[in-house]
Structures are given as C-alpha cells and as structure tokens.
C-alpha cells in the first residue's frame, strides 16, 4: 500500500480540474487579448473562471488577479502595501515568526530598504491573537500580513478578529491563505481582508497558477512589467488552461467542503490520538484551531530525514519540518518559532491529508510510524544517552 500524506506540499489533480483544462490545451488555444473569435472564446473562459473564484471568496470578479501561484501573489501584495505606505511616510509592517518564505524573504528585502518589521511571538498556543496585532500597530504601520493557516503545523489564525482590528486602525490586512482556500469557509468582505493569496495546486488544481484577491480601490503595484493583462496589474498572457483548472477545482472543493472536511478532520484526529501514544512525542500547532488535514509531531531522539526515507520505503509519503531535506542542516524556522529546541525540531513529521485519503490508509500510517520511530531510536546515540541519563528528556 502507498499512502500519499503530503497534501500540504501539493495535491493530486481532480478529474474535474483535468477535464476543465483539456479544451484549452486542445482546440480553444486563443489568446484572450485577441479580438477575433478564437481569442474571445478564451476570454469567455477567463471571465467565467474569475467569476467562479470570486464567488468562492465572497468578492467581486474585478477584485481577482490571476498569478503564477501563491508566492507571486504574496510578493505583489506585500510590495504594493509597502510602496503605498512609503508614500505616506509609513514604513512599519507586522507579521508572525512562522510565515512562508515568500512572505519572510520579501519582508527581509524591505528591511534592507529601511522598513521595520515586527514579528509576533507564536510560542503561546502555537498561534497569535488579535490582541497581539492590536498592541503592535503603530501610527506608521502600513501593513499587517499573516498566514490564514500554517502550512507546517496547521494552526488556523483568528483572521476575522485580526481583520476587524486592522479595519478599526485603518491598516491594510493581507493574508497568505494558500493552505486555507478550498479547505475552510472564507468570505473576504465579512472577515475584513484587503488582500488574499491562493494557489491552485493546494486544492486539487494544477501547479503554476494562483490568484491574488485585492480589495477594490487598493493601489496595487506591478511587479511584472509588460502588457495590460489583468486590468494592467499583472503582465503576461494568462494561463487559460491552468486558470480554468484551478477555478473548477476550487468550485468543487467549496461545493463539497461541508461533506469532505469533517471526514478529513476525523482521520486527522485518529492520527493525533494514535501518534500521541508514542513516548516522548509532542503535537505541533494549535490543538483546537487546526486545519482539517494537518498532523505535525516531533519525536525525540530521531532525525526527520531518516524518518521520511524509511516511511517512504514502507509506503507512506510524508514530510518533515526539518529543512535538511533541502540541503540545509537547520531545523524548520516554524518549529523554532513555536519554541521547539534544535534537537527536537530535527525529529519532526508532518502528515497532511485530503478527502482522497481513506481509513485503511490511516490504519497503515498508525502501524508503520511507531515501528519506524522505534527502529530509529534503537540506532540513535542520542536516544541511548537519553535512556542512560546522559541527556535529559525534553518531551
């Protein structure tokens, strides 16, 4: 049995998304900017997809800008707010310590330009509060940008409350909702969200396509110069097949959310209950306000990379919070931000589920993970030191 439990990294494309793309990979190949009939057929598809995405987010179609994915959307949102604030003498930004690198790296570049960034502490409850945001806002704050839900530890932030704080203070609010869209009910107007980023491949759509919701009237800055596509806010011929596939996948996800997500959450809870029985383990992330499919654990005395490789050999595709799999020896910045020490953060495991997973697959994971953890501990000098008292247990 092979179990795919890495849906926070990417999801399998749905049949609905594939079918929606096929006509635009075949005979409807026109450029939507062209005036002839072939181009106009593509434009009709583009307009319909924009309408679909807008309906799912609770906004107007003209407030949707199609992008190449969540990273581009994050960059454009943050840079736009920064440039707008700069013109008014405001160069202070608020974020959290556990954001995606698309946000953190963009903010780091702005810091080099003289912007000041406040990184909110997430150690308490592995989350932030609206009060933390309120306390951090200053007269020169030009943006609050927080994840909607964390890709690694699954914590869902109090977005509506943060949005209300920002609205009252007159500060633009952007949320990276890449992990939330298609999995949680979202209404950007009711939640006072000014900008929101999403990515198609996180909800069974294609890779390489995403969108940025921008509240009508907000001064968006181009980060790609060229033609006048996307109301002049994002140059480049639109990826019609990808956009149509993403819109179809999002509609399907939203239409079946109330049916699918409780079942996914039930599988998540089974995993959390079962893995919590492994000695010297700890759940990462908010235990209550949590994505339906996210399970994140740290196991003391093992290395995450070894855990992943052995799980893969036993048919479980998962991921680790440790960045060692990308060539770095440093543990995840998210795990460090919530207070995990280096040795513990290195022994992390993230299992992320979708509606395509089954109860039988959960049974397999619950059988395999404890076996692999014990196997690795039996070989670990760190674990031996813990058992003999040369080191002190942390978990």
Q: Residue locations for each model-derived region?
A:
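Pyridoxal 5′-phosphate
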Residues: 1-395
């Amino acid at each position: 049995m092979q179990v795919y439990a890495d849906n926070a990294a990417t999801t399998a494309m749905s049949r609905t998304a594939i079918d929606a793309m096929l006509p635009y990979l075949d005979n409807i190949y026109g450029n939507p900017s062209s005036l002839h009939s072939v181009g106009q057929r593509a434009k009709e598809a583009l307009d319909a997809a924009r309408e679909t995405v807008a309906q799912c987010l609770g906004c107007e179609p003209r407030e949707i800008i199609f992008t190449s994915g969540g990273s581009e959307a994050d960059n454009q949102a943050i840079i736009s707010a920064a440039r707008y604030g700069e013109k008014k003498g405001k160069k202070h930004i608020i974020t959290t310590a556990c954001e995606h690198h698309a946000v953190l790296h963009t903010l780091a570049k702005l810091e080099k330009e003289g912007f000041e960034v406040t990184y909110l502490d997430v150690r308490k409850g592995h989350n932030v509060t609206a009060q933390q945001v309120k306390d951090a806002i200053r007269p020169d704050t030009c943006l609050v940008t927080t994840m909607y839900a964390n890709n690694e530890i699954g914590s869902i932030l109090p977005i509506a409350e943060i949005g209300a704080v920002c609205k009252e203070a007159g500060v633009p609010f952007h949320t990276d909702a890449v992990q939330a869209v298609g999995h949680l009910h979202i209404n950007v107007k009711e939640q006072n969200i000014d900008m929101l980023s999403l990515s198609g491949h996180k909800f069974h759509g294609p890779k390489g396509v995403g969108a940025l919701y921008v509240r009508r009237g907000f001064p968006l800055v181009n980060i790609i110069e060229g033609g006048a596509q996307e109301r002049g806010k994002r140059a480049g011929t639109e990826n019609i097949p990808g956009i149509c596939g993403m819109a179809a996948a999002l509609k399907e996800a939203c239409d079946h959310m109330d049916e699918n997500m409780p079942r996914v959450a039930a599988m998540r809870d089974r995993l959390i209950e079962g893995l919590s029985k492994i000695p010297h383990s700890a759940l990462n992330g908010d235990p209550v306000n949590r994505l339906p499919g996210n399970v994140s654990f740290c196991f003391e005395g093992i290395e995450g990379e070894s855990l992943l490789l052995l799980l893969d050999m036993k048919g479980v595709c998962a991921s680790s919070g440790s960045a060692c799999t990308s060539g770095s020896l440093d543990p995840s910045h998210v795990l460090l931000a919530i207070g995990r020490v280096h040795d513990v953060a290195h022994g992390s495991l993230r299992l992320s589920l979708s509606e395509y997973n089954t109860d039988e697959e959960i049974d397999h994971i619950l059988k395999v993970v404890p076996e692999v953890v014990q196997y690795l501990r039996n070989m670990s000098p760190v674990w031996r030191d813990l058992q003999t008292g040369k080191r002190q247990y942390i978990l």
